[in-house]
């Protein structure tokens, strides 16, 4: 008799495939009501995701407007910088024509300047740059022997540095523009779609995207070119067919931005001394010109800069002053261009980051491939509710809820008993935890 009673108790506790909460059975009707409440939360999150996508689209457009404004400023600064560089080169050419005037004086000073410059540079390199001192020393000696004191006198190193900087700046902007143009052509087509100009409706009841046929904005030669929204009015929503082309395009746009943006060879000047030292080390290894920046530490080198040849050629004073003025202007606009270029690059990275967010939003929604494939009307279906009394694996003080979300395998979530089954927040908490796990799983795939 006792065995029979125990058997009956066991059957009651496992009634209807384990759909029990302690000793109280959870009926099919209750499970259906819970599924309905949970699905409402999922529906709200889908709508939020779609709104989020549009918000990111708006941010991308705002960033693009800021980028255009910066590009206009860059073009203006570039024109002024190039004018100053041309003036500098003209002044340099005129000065070169009179370089023999003080040649003997300069050569004598140059012979005393070179040993000090080499020693100062090699000490710096050994202390800061460290690697390859022997090779650099040999290269530096050749460089100094081939250099002219007149080049030193008219700040040829500053001129060459400006010209090299100009070349690198132009290349950096070309790389960024190429990246943006590739991404922009994709985004232009993406954002022309009617989806981005309409408010998201209630996805739980009908497809908000099937009310109108989409115009063929995409180039028919594209692999993904097709009618993205071919669904007739009120046909159930299929997220995969709807969003996968969008998802593919966003991924392509992000790749187009990232591939080149992270390979820009130009390094923006940074105020910190250790960063400046790295730049000087690179210049010394490259062609020894970095050593000329140490001329202020050698007295005889400074004397070369102070040589006055005006007694032999009065016009040279004016030419040298013109060169000095144009150099200062060119350096000023080069620095301004650097600052604008760096801001421009930051805008590009911001756009890339926003595309990444857009990618993540679409990634989740576009994974809902079988959302309406089954006859089940619920996004979220509760299959089992249990507690520690009905399942020894459930921690004390928790309620175990097993759900199916979309086409997923069963997902188990634990809800603190402080949030009771009668609490309106119960199913919202269940749905939130289940959705977090669902999204995490798809991020890992």
Swiss-Prot record:
Q: Where's the motif Nuclear localization signal?
A: 78-81, 439-443
Q: Which UniProt keywords apply?
A: Chaperone, Cytoplasm, Cytoplasmic vesicle, Disulfide bond, Endoplasmic reticulum, Glycoprotein, Membrane, Microsome, Mitochondrion, Nucleus, Phosphoprotein, Secreted, Signal, Ubl conjugation
**Among the entry's GO cellular component annotations, what is one?**
extracellular space
Q: In this UniProt entry, which cysteines form S-S bonds?
A: 102-309, 113-301, 116-298, 121-291, 129-281
Q: Which residues carry this modification: Phosphoserine?
A: 133, 392
The places in or outside the cell where this protein is found are: Secreted; Nucleus; Cytoplasm; Mitochondrion membrane
A biological process from GO: positive regulation of apoptotic process
Q: Which InterPro entries match?
A: Clusterin (IPR016016), Clusterin-like (IPR000753), Clusterin_C (IPR016015), Clusterin_CS (IPR033986), Clusterin_N (IPR016014)
- Which terms does the record give in the GO molecular function aspect? misfolded protein binding; protein-folding chaperone binding; ubiquitin protein ligase binding; unfolded protein binding
Q: What is its main location?
A: secreted
Role played: Functions as extracellular chaperone that prevents aggregation of non native proteins. Prevents stress-induced aggregation of blood plasma proteins. Inhibits formation of amyloid fibrils by APP, APOC2, B2M, CALCA, CSN3, SNCA and aggregation-prone LYZ variants (in vitro). Does not require ATP. Maintains partially unfolded proteins in a state appropriate for subsequent refolding by other chaperones, such as HSPA8/HSC70. Does not refold proteins by itself.
Q: How does it assemble?
A: Antiparallel disulfide-linked heterodimer of an alpha chain and a beta chain. Self-associates and forms higher oligomers. Interacts with a broad range of misfolded proteins, including APP, APOC2 and LYZ. Slightly acidic pH promotes interaction with misfolded proteins. Forms high-molecular weight oligomers upon interaction with misfolded proteins. Interacts with APOA1, LRP2, CLUAP1 and PON1. Interacts with the complement membrane attack complex. Interacts (via alpha chain) with XRCC6.
Q: What is this protein called?
A: Clusterin
Name its species: Canis lupus familiaris (Dog)
From the broadest rank down, the organism's phylogenetic lineage runs:
Eukaryota, Metazoa, Chordata, Craniata, Vertebrata
Q: Which gene encodes it?
A: CLU
């Amino acid at each position: 008799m006792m065995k029979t009673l125990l058997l009956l108790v066991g059957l009651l506790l496992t009634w209807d495939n384990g759909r029990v909460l302690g000793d109280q059975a959870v009926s099919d009707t209750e499970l259906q009501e819970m599924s309905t409440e949970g699905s409402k939360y999922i529906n709200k999150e889908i709508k939020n995701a779609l709104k989020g996508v549009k918000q990111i689209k708006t941010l991308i457009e705002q960033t693009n407007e800021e980028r255009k404004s910066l590009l206009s400023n860059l073009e203006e600064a570039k024109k002024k910088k190039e004018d100053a560089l041309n003036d500098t080169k003209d002044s340099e050419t005129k000065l070169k024509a009179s370089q023999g005037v003080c040649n003997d004086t300069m050569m004598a000073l140059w012979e005393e300047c070179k040993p000090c410059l080499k020693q100062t540079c090699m000490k710096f390199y050994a202390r800061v740059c460290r690697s390859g001192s022997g090779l650099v020393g040999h290269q530096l000696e050749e460089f100094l022997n081939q250099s002219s004191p007149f080049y030193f006198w008219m700040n040829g190193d500053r001129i060459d540095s400006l010209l090299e900087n100009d070349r690198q700046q132009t290349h950096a902007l070309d790389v960024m523009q190429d990246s943006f143009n590739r991404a922009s052509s994709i985004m232009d087509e993406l954002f022309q779609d009617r989806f981005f100009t309409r408010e998201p409706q209630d996805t739980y009841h009908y497809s908000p995207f099937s009310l109108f046929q989409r115009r063929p904005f995409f180039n028919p030669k594209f692999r993904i070119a097709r009618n993205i929204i071919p669904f007739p009015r009120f046909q159930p929503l299929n997220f995969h067919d709807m969003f996968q082309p969008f998802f593919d395009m966003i991924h392509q746009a992000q790749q187009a931005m990232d591939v080149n943006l992270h390979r820009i060879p130009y390094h923006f000047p940074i105020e910190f001394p250790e960063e400046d030292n790295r730049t000087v080390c690179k210049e010394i290894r490259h062609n020894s010109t970095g050593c000329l920046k140490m001329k202020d530490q050698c007295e005889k080198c400074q004397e070369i800069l102070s040589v006055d040849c005006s007694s032999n050629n009065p016009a040279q004073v004016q030419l040298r002053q013109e060169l000095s003025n144009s150099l200062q202007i060119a350096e000023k606009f080069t620095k301004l261009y650097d600052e604008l270029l760096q801001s421009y690059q930051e805008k590009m990275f911001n756009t890339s980051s926003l595309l990444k967010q857009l990618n993540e939003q679409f990634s989740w929604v576009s994974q809902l491939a079988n959302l309406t494939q089954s006859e089940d009307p619920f996004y979220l279906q509760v299959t089992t509710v249990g507690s520690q009394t009905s399942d020894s694996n459930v921690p004390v003080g928790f309620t175990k809820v097993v759900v199916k979300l979309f086409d997923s395998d069963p997902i188990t979530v634990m809800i603190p008993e402080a949030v009771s089954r009668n609490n309106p927040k119960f199913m919202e908490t269940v749905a939130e935890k289940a959705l977090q796990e669902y999204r995490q799983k798809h991020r890992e795939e």
